[in-house]
Amino acid sequence: MKPKIFYLLINIFFCCVCYAQQAYNVRSPYDPATQKLEAALRGEVLQFTLDNSAIYPGTQREVLVYVPQQYDGSQPACLLVCMDGILYDATTVMDNLIATGEMPVTIGVFVNPGIVYDHSQEVVRYNRCKEFDSTDDTFARFLETEVLPRVEGMQTEQGKTISLSQDPNDRCITGASSGGIAAFSVAWHRPDLFSRVYTSVGTFVAMRGGNNYPAIVRKTEPKPLRIYMQDGWYDVWNPIFGEWFEYNLLMESAFNFAGYEVAHLWDRGNHSIKYGTLAFPDAMRWLWRGYPAKVEKGISNNGMLQTILAEGEDWQEIALAHAPKELFACSDSAAVFAVGNNIYKVSSTGDITESGKLKAGERLLGEGLTTRGSALYRHGQKVAEGLHGLQAAYALSDNRYITLCASNAHSSDKVWVVNAGCRALAIAPDYRYCVTGEAHTHHLISTIIDTAGNMRYSEPFYYLHDLSNGTLQPSGAMAFDTQGNLYVATAMGVQVADHNGRVRAILSLPAGEVQGLAFSGHYLYVLCGERLFVRRMNAVGHIPSEGALTYPSQGQG
């Protein structure tokens, strides 16, 4: 054989081998759940058009609703939500798994992405990427307030009224590609809506911030989620945004680190629905195994979470007759707040007592601290004036104070003044620096305090995480623990930063974004919308009025 022909044949051989390694494995194991049942045993599929969305204005979409043959309407059914319509031949698989008892009686809701048409019915905007790849809670709110209420109360051909369970343990959500990250985002933001998640070739890449999820999962207190992931070694839809498979590996690693129940199927596929369809029956079996036992929170390997959280303790709600807008720490493991002209004190056990009155035009700034006009008062006595635009204040030891003003007020021996256009202020336990908020950025400002109380060397030092897709909601109240870690109220939770300005832990919220925060003794209080919660911590909050204290440095690592 001539050498040229030989080398040509060798090249052809290796090309064929490489192609075969990337080709689909068409000899996938047979799964009986993929076979259609006879017509009498199949579920019914209903359909409606949703074209009046307030959340995604102008969009039109088809929603399909699968009702299994076993559903009799006598009690609420479990729920499966799937993006992009009926994927995975899901209705056939559900027919089979429900019939064999491997899956509970489950209503399927298959939601297509929105499309906006112009006056001539030409597509002017595809909303899929916006809806599915965004990492905020918008799509979760869309499902909760616009899609699922339309499904509730629908009638089947047999006259059965659809009723959906409101228990997240009875709910599963899934999607492929951008629908995969959408499924995860919904459950991540709203574990009160969904506990079980299946992602196929999930787009955890740099589309609209999904590439940030691995770090955030590692830092966030575990949520009660069970997750099944499928992806292929050759999954790269568009390398501009990243390697899909690499980011799925990063997500799985983060889930394992953070203590989640997670399973995966890595195959030889690329960015396709094929293997996601093959994996769907086993994904459903795994996600629903042990049902109706609850999906539980895991235990994270995050050292900061392990240090600051008290084992077995969770948020406890305190009933409020009227919701305050701000919350302040007291020196006896309690917090104070004002509603109207009344000042209330709340204990860690939930007891609320009236503790004082505000004068006309007076605003509460903390325990015993108020402001009226440009003056600062403590226990009704004026301690400073000329503090125009006074936003926040702390009493320190030795009858000193630190204040935050929106004008160019000046410090004195008695009153230290930070000038900034925000309302968030915290002072380190050793009094050597303070932290102020900075609206519409990811940063908090660290300012050194010299021995004369002068503010020096301010810089954007603390970096906060954000999943709001660019709205950059301003951070709220802040507090230090006795080890110098900073707790910050943000839209995505209480973020806990170390001495070097890095967020190491994020505490999950019981309801909505945190608007107020107070840390006293072992008790962390948070105000979420109009609801107040308290949680016993292992960490101890620092009360500035109790004096400065030293704590070990965390070094520069």
Where are these regions (language model features)?
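Beta-rich, blade/repeat-based domains predominating
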Residues: 321-334, 358-375, 385-405, 415-434, ...
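Beta-propeller fold detector
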Residues: 316-319, 353-358, 383-386, 416, ...
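Beta-strand-rich domains and repeat architectures in extracellular enzymes and scaffolds
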Residues: 303-304, 314-341
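Blade/loop signatures of beta-propeller domains
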Residues: 295-315, 405, 453-455, 544-545
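Short loop/turn segments immediately following beta-strands, especially the blade-tip
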Residues: 447-454, 536-544
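Short loop/turn segments immediately following the C-termini of beta-strands
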Residues: 338-340, 373-374, 404-407, 439, ...
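Non-catalytic cap/lid and distal C-terminal segments of serine-dependent acyl enzymes
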Residues: 21-297
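Bacterial N-terminal signal peptides
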Residues: 7-16
